[in-house]
């Protein structure tokens, strides 16, 4: 996979962006927010760091079934600056153990359509959907919302999405210079 990069959150810790870029990371997706209640405390520093290292960079929102789409979009829009150089935004869809509600598919698709429209309007470009296998199995998002897909699967290319994927988190535990601990390593389909 010739184009590879990383996903970071405040949980990743401090990142040495120049070192990370030298290790082969072409791009970075940086978590801006989780749901409507958490603004990632390292978002601004990571955004500046990735840009300063000459990497392509984009913002990610971790979707929550426990918050309204409008509130999550507001959190994203007040955190992420409008930036024509930024990569398309990504909305991560997975189950959060601290959020127990599991609404029906129609309600989830309705909320996601609202969220996608608001995030895309702010970013000025179509969003990617990073869908976990269990979330897609329950809600069949890949069939319900026509957006570029990003899937997850350690080491082996996943086949759970009903449409071809464009991005894949190939490892959520890669160790690389420039980061203490593990990092999510992402690849783009050739």
Model-derived segments and spans:
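Hydrophobic anchor at the start of a short beta-strand
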Residues: 57, 126-127, 149
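Functionally critical loop-and-helix segments that line ligand-binding/catalytic clefts
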Residues: 1-8, 12-13, 144-190
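Alpha-helix initiation/capping motif
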Residues: 40, 104, 131-132, 141, ...
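Aromatic-lined carbohydrate-recognition surfaces of secreted/lumenal glycan-active proteins
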Residues: 124-137
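Flexible, glycine-rich phosphate/dinucleotide-binding loops
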Residues: 36-37, 66, 136, 158, ...
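Substrate-binding cleft of extracellular glycoside hydrolase catalytic domains
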Residues: 1-22, 26-122
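Structural recognition of alpha->loop->beta junctions
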Residues: 75-97, 139-165
